[in-house]
Structures are given as C-alpha cells and as structure tokens.
Amino acid sequence: MSWFADLVRRAPVLNIAADEGEGSVIVLLHGIASSASTFELVIPELRKHHRIIAIELLGFGKSPAPEDCEYTIDEHVAAISATIRSLHLREPFILVGHSLGSLLAARYAARHPREVSRLVLASPPIYLRPEEIGDPLVRGHVSAYMRAFGFLRENKDFTITTAAKVSDLLKLGATLSITEQNWRAFTLSLQRCIESQTTISDIAEANCPIDVVVGTLDEFVAPGTLDIIGKMRHVTTHRVIANDHVVRRRLAKVILKTIDGDEAHIH
C-alpha cells in the first residue's frame, strides 16, 4: 500500500452538503473558511441535468476537524478521496473547485487521472514562490500577498473580527466564516495549501480539459500566474468582467456555460 493510499484509508469521510439531481456527476469543492453555500447560484441550474455532489472541506462547514490534522494538501485531498470513494461512482466526473477548492481539485485530478473527465477551477489563488519569479514587479506583488497572509495568521482577533465585518457588509453569509471553531483549519490550510503550493505542476500533470474561470476584479489573483497556466494546451481561461473572488452571478454564469454550453443560464 502506498503512503497516499494509507492516508486515504485513515482519512475521515467529509460532509456531503448536497447530493441532488440525476445524470452525469459533478463534484463541487468550496474554498477556505467557507462552505457549500459558495455554489448556491450554480447548484439549482446544474441539478436540472446532472447529479450534483457538494462536499465540504476538512475542518469547514459541517465536516470533521480532527485534532491531529495538519491540514496539508495531501490530508485535504485524502479526505476528498475517501468521501468520493464512499459514493461508489461508476463513471468519471466533472470536478469544480472554488478558491482553495480549485487547488485541491487540481491535485485530485493529478492523483486520480482516470476519475476526472474535466476540471473547472474558479478563482484559483495560484502563486509561485517569490524566489522563483524573475519579473521584479510580479515578485513584489506575490511577496505582498505572502506578507498579508502571514499577518492574517498571526493576528487572530483582527482576522476573525474583520472577516465577520466583511461578511456582513457584502452579505456573504456562510461563504466567508472565520471563527474560533475553524481557526486552526483556516490558518494551517492557508499556510500549507495556499502559501506553499504546487498547483502549476498539478495542472500540468492533469490529463483532462481544464477551464479556469476568474474575475477581472479578483483581489487574490497575482499578475503573471494565469499567463503561465494559460499557455498549457489543455487549459482554457475565461475572464469574467467586473467580478471579484466570490461566485457571484457573472462568475456563476460562466461556470455554468463551461459545463453546459449556451443552454445554461441564471434568472
């Protein structure tokens, strides 16, 4: 048994927040400090023609948060693998991830190439290590992101209070929730899956078509990184005008269109 297979065997099964509809399967993975409510605009449309399975990530929503979990990308993906395995799916499925969920989706597709027929990565926070970036302007931007993330991790009270205010102001509800209960999952996932990541190589390794959907106002997209993956033959990038990091109507419409073509729409 490989080390990853053993990790999957020991991983907890995550909360399945939605399992609705019939047809080809689409699995949804939300982002950091969030829940399956991220996809509230896309689930009603997708379930008309597909079986929709929305999984809540390790440590978030109603999923388990083991005390000994370090929230590495391998632990996250192992738990996703254990959950999908428990469903006994017979055919390859479309895997849709938002924010952190998109990074986990890319790693899942790289590890399980026979299971994923298509990847849709919405608002992926893809970063290279600053020392790997030649362009000084891009390197400066990415370094600023890393400092900001470090500040959030090191200032618990500020981060929890600010997140609550932002959530209320923008009416995000459970789409953004940083609390005492998920603080450990938030900080470790941020540090070990977003600040330190191999997403570009995971995307390169995946052997299925990949659609990257990103808003032009996304505050977590570093300049230059999308250009790198956009040059890969199996990647198509969709830029959504006047949308930020959140799955709002404009972004939701493009996600639906990448999956169901012109038939998809949101009223």
Can you say where each PLM-predicted feature lies in the sequence?
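Flexible "cap/lid" loop of the alpha/beta hydrolase fold
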Residues: 110, 118-148
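Short glycine-enriched nucleophile-adjacent loop
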Residues: 102-113, 119
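Conserved alpha/beta-hydrolase catalytic His-Asp/Glu region
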Residues: 121, 130-132, 149-205
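Alpha/beta-hydrolase fold catalytic core
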Residues: 1-27, 47-51, 77, 82-92, ...
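Conserved alpha/beta-hydrolase "nucleophile elbow" surrounding the catalytic nucleophile
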Residues: 30-32, 97-102, 215
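Conserved loop-alpha-helix segment in the C-terminal half of the alpha/beta-hydrolase fold
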Residues: 210-243, 249
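Active-site loop/oxyanion-hole signature of alpha/beta-hydrolase fold enzymes
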Residues: 54-96
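Conserved HGGG/HGGXW glycine-rich cap/lid loop of the alpha/beta-hydrolase fold
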Residues: 18-62
